């Protein structure tokens, strides 16, 4: 009898152990939901407080380096959502950089919207941008689409390439260039347009791309050779694309989404897009807060807005067909229909570009003898 009681007692103890183990495994499930709920509640509370503070400031001033149509509707949407008056001005990235450098910590604008990150990095290094840890940055597709210290956040990705007027090339008896090296062929003399290295972030990306592709000295020499065929250097990066369809520009170097705009929205079926056969690079279009801005809470709210579908989904309905870089956005199908692939790009060294672009621009302009009248912006 005693032996039987001992066996029963042992079985009860083992059962108790299993029951204990089972309850310990389920414990995180009972606490995970409240923890997530608390986080969401804290984020919602933060946004409510930020919106109230931004509305108390009443105004936001935006400098936009994206296309003006997209800039306008984004600013209108922000004003509609939050009841904050938005003033905006469209400037190239180089113009924005020059403006806030001159204002030196007392900016007339609050935020920068659009344009490639190279000028943003120069301004961040000069202490002209304000770091901000955005709540909506959690939706970015990867760390490559933000500054590590929060000085800027990516909103889109654009592919660099050529746009050509096939009617004009056919009339001239010339084939479509397929790669970067083709553009230095003397037969294309006077047919190429490129943006200005001094004023356009697109042109700065071209410099970085050639140096990373060919090496420092060879990259600068490539740009010297290319210069012999360049007819016009435009102030803005989208300038070449806007003149290809009319035939004024026969070969334009720039972002291919700008070419799509000309084909789809403006009806220029004579434009062909060319992705360089040996590879190409890309921009990350960004947004940032100016250090010392007059409306800091409205500026922070803009960053949250810019990292949301409310903002970025407006792009493709307003002539901007870049790939989007947040996980809850709707990608522009038309970009892939034209053969663009956001992953089919070279391994672009953003750190080298960040640290050296100012020096590279100076070196290129020196190699070009300081630049002729084509580089005048007035």
PLM ranges: what are they?
Residues 1-57, 373-378:
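Short, low-complexity disordered leader/linker segments with a strong preference
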Residues 61-75, 87-103, 107-248:
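Extracytoplasmic ligand-binding site segments that recognize negatively charged/polar headgroups
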Residues 74-82:
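A short alpha-helix/helix-coil micro-patch that ends at or immediately precedes a cysteine
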Residues 118-122, 251-270:
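A ligand-binding cleft/hinge motif common to bilobed small-molecule-binding domains
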Residues 120, 169, 259, 311-312:
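A generic structural signal for short hydrophobic patches within well-formed alpha-helices
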Residues 158, 222-227, 233-234, 267-291:
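Periplasmic-binding protein-like
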Residues 280-348:
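Mature extracytoplasmic/periplasmic domains
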Residues 340-378:
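Conserved C-terminal helix/tail region of periplasmic/extracytoplasmic solute-binding proteins
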């Amino acid at each position: 009898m005693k032996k039987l009681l001992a066996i029963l007692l042992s079985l009860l103890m083992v059962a108790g152990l299993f029951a204990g183990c089972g309850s310990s495994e389920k414990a995180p499930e009972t606490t995970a939901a409240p923890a997530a709920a608390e986080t969401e509640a804290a984020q919602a509370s933060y946004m409510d407080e930020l919106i109230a503070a931004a509305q108390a400031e009443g105004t936001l001033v935006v400098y936009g380096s994206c296309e003006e149509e997209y800039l306008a509707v984004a600013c209108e949407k922000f004003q509609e959502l939050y009841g904050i008056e938005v003033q905006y001005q469209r400037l190239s990235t180089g113009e924005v950089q020059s403006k806030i450098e001159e204002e030196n910590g007392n900016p007339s604008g609050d935020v920068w919207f659009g344009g490639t990150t190279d000028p943003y990095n120069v301004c961040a290094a000069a202490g002209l941008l304000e770091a901000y840890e955005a709540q909506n940055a959690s939706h970015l597709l990867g760390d490559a689409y933000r500054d590590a210290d929060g000085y800027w956040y990516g909103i889109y990705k654009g592919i660099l390439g050529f746009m050509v007027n096939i009617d004009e090339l056919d009339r001239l008896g010339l084939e479509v260039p397929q790669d970067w090296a083709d553009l230095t062929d003397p037969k294309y003399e006077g047919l190429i347009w490129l943006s200005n290295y001094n004023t356009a972030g697109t042109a700065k990306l071209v410099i970085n791309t050639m140096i990373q592709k060919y090496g420092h000295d060879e990259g600068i020499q490539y740009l010297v050779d290319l210069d012999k065929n360049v007819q016009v250097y435009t102030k803005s990066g989208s300038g070449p694309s806007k003149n290809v369809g009319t035939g004024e520009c026969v070969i334009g170097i720039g972002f291919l989404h700008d070419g799509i705009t000309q084909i789809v929205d403006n009806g220029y079926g004579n434009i062909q897009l060319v992705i360089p056969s040996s590879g190409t690079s890309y921009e990350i279009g960004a947004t940032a807060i100016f250090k010392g801005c007059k409306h800091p809470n409205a500026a922070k709210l803009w960053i949250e807005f810019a990292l949301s579908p409310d903002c970025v989904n407006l792009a493709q309905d307003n002539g901007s067909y870049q790939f989007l870089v947040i996980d809850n956005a709707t990608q522009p199908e038309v970009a892939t229909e034209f053969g663009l692939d956001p992953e089919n790009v070279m391994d672009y060294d953003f750190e080298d570009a960040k640290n050296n672009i100012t020096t590279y621009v100076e070196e290129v302009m020196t190699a070009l003898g300081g630049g002729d009248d084509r580089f005048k912006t007035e």
